[in-house]
Amino acid sequence: MIKKNWVLILDFDSTLISIESLDLLAEICLQNKINSASIITKIKNLTSLGMKGEITFQDSLKKRLRYLQIEDYHFDQLNKKLKNFISPSIIKNQTWLKKNRDNIFIFSGGFKRVIDPIALSLGLKENQVFGNEFLYGNNGSIMGLDFQNLLSQSNGKFLLAEKLGMKKDIIMVGDGKTDAEIKQLDKSAVFIAYTENVCRKSVLDIADRKAKTFDDVIDYFSNMK
């Protein structure tokens, strides 16, 4: 149960971690493949276009996944690598995160099975982590993405917050335009553009505040009235 009068929603890619996890997954899936460098560049460009709001997130996600044939074992490799990419100021402030975990959610267009290990290592609650999930066949093989999941859709973060009935003061922290969607929820919702890992002018232009590191986010809460 949330005891405080605020809810903090964190993005994952380029926020909690310093990179885009799908870009790294692409490098793993395509290693030793012909034209892998060219395909990875295309995937990274699509990631950037989606984060800047130049194409919809759903369009960006679908186009990126078309380039990849993802196998289950790829996630084992990805999870081993990702623990080395947690943002420095996030590591520094793990105690604060754990102390306030009842009020902290993760909303991400990334994959929940990738996010969960990082979230747990930071002391956050797995049942407050929301991300995209795969559909599996009877033999356990990945059949595709669950496009019924709200986070696979454009405007998904807003739709998810609405579905969860979030009525507290909402503070969304992230690096992309998809994170700013939360401002549609309520006039009191605050979007903080997170720039520790990447800074996008189009995102800063619509942000209520900027955080160079997670220390700035903590300062915001310290100064809340």
Per-region residue spans from a language model:
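Substrate-recognition "cap/lid" segment bordering the active-site pocket of phosphatases
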Residues: 116-170
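Alpha-helical substrate-recognition element adjacent to the catalytic core
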Residues: 2-8, 12-122, 126-133
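Short, acidic/turn-prone active-site loops that include or flank metal/cofactor-
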Residues: 131-136, 195-200, 214-219
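Short, charged, surface-exposed secondary-structure boundary motifs
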Residues: 137-143, 200-208, 220-224
